[in-house]
């Protein structure tokens, strides 16, 4: 099974491409599970991050400025319990039920807790189609490990290719284009 990474600039084009890919996979009857991360920005300032279980739609705002925590993402305090309460059940269920597993913002999420890191590492070893979004410049060990896995294709999304990339990725997932 192919593992796809989508990298790109900060902003919404990764999320838009991922949403399009998920829509096309759902139209093919694929069971898609995992989690999505969204950010809330006001006046060009990052306010918070939320995480959502794709299947149950359960959502939590897990990172904000006013959360006091040793764990931080982009200077925001992280409520690790809220994050674990969504990410871990979502990925546990996906391991057995999903055709395609989504891990959004791999570089930001996996180092928040040992439990999250462990389940993400387990999921990445599965023989399933996995789509992750990655921060473009991250030197994170988990990202390096992801890039070194077998049958991984990493696509860099840009404003120029953002409309065609979802179709190209779908072809790779469906085995219509060589993945190595």
Swiss-Prot record:
Molecular-function GO terms, alphabetical: ATP binding; ribonucleoside triphosphate phosphatase activity
Binding-site residues for ATP, renumbered to this chain: 8-15, 100-107
Reaction catalyzed: a ribonucleoside 5'-triphosphate + H2O = a ribonucleoside 5'-diphosphate + phosphate + H(+)
Pfam families: NTPase_1 (PF03266)
EC annotation from Swiss-Prot or TrEMBL: 3.6.1.15
Organism: Picrophilus torridus (strain ATCC 700027 / DSM 9790 / JCM 10055 / NBRC 100828 / KAW 2/3)
EC category: hydrolase
Protein name in the entry: Nucleoside-triphosphatase THEP1
Superkingdom field: Archaea
Family of the protein in this entry: Belongs to the THEP1 NTPase family.
């Amino acid at each position: 099974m192919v593992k796809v990474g989508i990298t790109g600039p900060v902003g919404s084009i990764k999320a838009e491409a991922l949403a399009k890919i998920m829509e096309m996979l759902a139209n093919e009857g694929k069971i898609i599970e995992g989690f999505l991360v969204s950010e809330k920005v006001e006046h060009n300032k990052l306010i918070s991050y939320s995480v959502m279980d794709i299947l149950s739609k359960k959502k939590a705002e897990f990172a904000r400025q006013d959360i006091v925590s040793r764990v931080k993402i982009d200077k925001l305090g992280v409520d690790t319990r809220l994050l674990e309460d969504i990410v871990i059940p979502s990925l546990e269920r996906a391991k057995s039920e999903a055709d395609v597993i989504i891990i959004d913002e791999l570089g930001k999420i996996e180092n928040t807790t040992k439990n999250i890191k462990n389940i993400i590492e387990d999921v990445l070893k599965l023989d399933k189609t996995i789509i992750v979004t990655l921060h473009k410049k991250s030197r994170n060990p988990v990202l390096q490990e992801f890039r070194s896995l077998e049958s991984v294709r990493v696509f860099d999304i840009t404003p120029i290719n953002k409309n065609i990339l979802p179709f190209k990725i779908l072809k790779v997932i469906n085995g219509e284009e060589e993945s190595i």
